[in-house]
From Swiss-Prot:
Composition bias type Gly residues, residue spans: 92-107
NCBIfam families according to UniProt: PRK05325.1-2, PRK05325.1-3
Family per similarity comment: Belongs to the UPF0229 family.
InterPro entries: UPF0229
Location of the region described as Disordered in the Swiss-Prot/TrEMBL record: 81-108
Protein name according to UniProt: UPF0229 protein PP_0396
Domain of life: Bacteria
């Protein structure tokens, strides 16, 4: 029984390459549609893709054709409606399409082209051109960061890695090299035999000697093995170091009593978007969740997003806990440290200068990037202005933005994590 092994990269989906080419070609249309979808959908509603509409006029291929106007002399087949010398009226232009309008009895057009993108494609366009700023390659982090790559051909190796084409090529070259002289003698003997049979058919003695010589040469050639151990060639595979960056993201969320339910929902949506972004784009990254009111506590993912605990507001408690965790588990010499903080800006007045002091002296010198998002439609309070002073001192590694409504989440997120050009 024979077996067919499908080694195609695309498997049974023969249209994958065409689909990828189509997505590249209409990237701007798809990207715009994804941004509109994000603005109207819940951030937590990411389990499916999106329908994309492209105007029919944008998918037309450019063609060369006769322009409108002018006069043409064309011979048409005869019919019952027209006779010789009559003028055929020009077709009335019209542009149909997917727009809303009144019905008409003339003209034609093209509807919008609608297709579905998958969840993976949706997230790819959603997070395109976003990255963690200042991510630095620091250390090789163990054997699991090595990758196996082809490194040529070897004369020894595992039988499962034998290179059949190179092996047969080597065997063929060896047989040609070792039997070259015998084959040349065989050709000469064959020519001599043909000559004797034509010119001296009665010379049986010489004919018999030449035939014996031919048999001897053929036997010598056939004694050479078809395949020798010298011919075996193997694919050489080596482990190549794959430097990976160790990164940790601290997520600090204010859950104090001043945070209304709507404000908390916006904060949760922002962090859910951040969590999706990190998990999709960075394989080796850890996330630390910290909730705070008058006191701060490290929690797991479930409790961070869904716990109903609340209280007063002392923002510095979260910063102190973050600094302790950094010192204990994430030394700056080995880790790329990031932080994202969300609050409504309402803080105990005497605590805001303490927050600035902790950030500027104990946290900012060790982090790659720190973002602060203030969720409020009101005027900024003391915490915002203290953080502005930090932004002046660390312009490359500190950023702050304001959120007013859920519609601001995605634009602000893109602004905070927009890919920067290397300097």
């Amino acid at each position: 029984m024979s077996y067919v092994i499908d080694r195609r990269l695309n498997g049974k989906n023969k249209s994958t390459v065409n689909r990828q080419r189509f997505l590249r070609r209409y990237r701007e249309h798809i990207k715009k549609a994804v941004e509109e979808a994000v603005s109207r959908r819940s951030i937590m509603d990411m389990e499916h893709g999106e329908q994309i509409s492209i105007p029919g006029r944008d998918i037309d291929e450019p063609v060369l054709h006769h322009g409108r106007g002018g006069k043409q002399t064309i011979v048409h087949p005869g019919n019952k409606e027209f006779t010789a010398g009559e003028h055929i009226p020009r077709p009335q232009g019209g542009g149909g399409g997917g727009g809303r309008g009144k019905a008409g009895n003339s003209g034609e057009g093209m509807d919008e082209f609608v297709f579905q993108i998958t969840q993976e494609e949706f997230l790819e366009f959603m997070f395109e051109d976003l990255e963690l700023p200042n991510l630095v390659k620091r250390h090789l982090t163990g054997a699991d960061t090595f990758k196996t790559v082809r490194a040529g051909i070897a004369n020894e190796g595992n039988p499962s890695r034998i290179n059949i084409v190179r092996t047969l090529r080597s065997a063929h070259a060896r047989r040609i090299a070792l039997t070259g002289s015998s084959r040349a003698l065989l050709r000469e003997a064959q020519k001599e035999l043909d000559r004797l049979r034509v010119e001296e058919p009665d010379n049986f003695t010489d004919i018999q000697e030449v035939e014996q010589e031919i048999e001897r040469l053929k036997a010598r050639i056939n004694r050479l093995p078809f395949l020798d151990t010298f011919d075996l060639k193997y694919n050489l595979l080596v482990k190549q170091p794959n430097p990976s960056s160790k990164a940790v993201m601290f997520c600090l969320m204010d859950v104090s009593g001043s945070m209304t339910q709507a404000t908390k929902d916006i904060a949760k949506r922002f962090f859910i978007l951040l969590y999706l972004f990190l998990k999709r784009n960075y394989e080796r990254i850890e996330v630390v969740f910290i909730r705070h009111h008058t006191s701060a506590r490290e929690v797991d993912e479930e409790e961070f997003f869904y716990s109903r605990e609340t209280g007063g507001t002392i923002v510095s408690s979260a910063l102190k806990l973050m600094q302790e965790i950094m010192a204990e588990r994430y030394p700056a010499s080995d880790w790329n440290i990031y932080a994202a903080q969300a609050s409504d800006g309402d803080n105990w007045n005497d605590d805001s200068p303490i927050c600035r002091d902790i950030l500027s002296k104990q946290i900012m010198p060790h982090v790659q990037y720190y973002t602060y998002v203030e969720i409020t439609p009101r005027e900024h309070q003391a915490l915002w202005y203290e953080y502005e002073r930090i932004g002046d001192a660390f312009p490359d590694t500190f950023a702050q933005q304001q959120l007013v409504s859920a519609g601001d989440i995605y634009p602000v997120f893109r602004e905070l994590f927009q890919r920067r050009l290397a300097t």
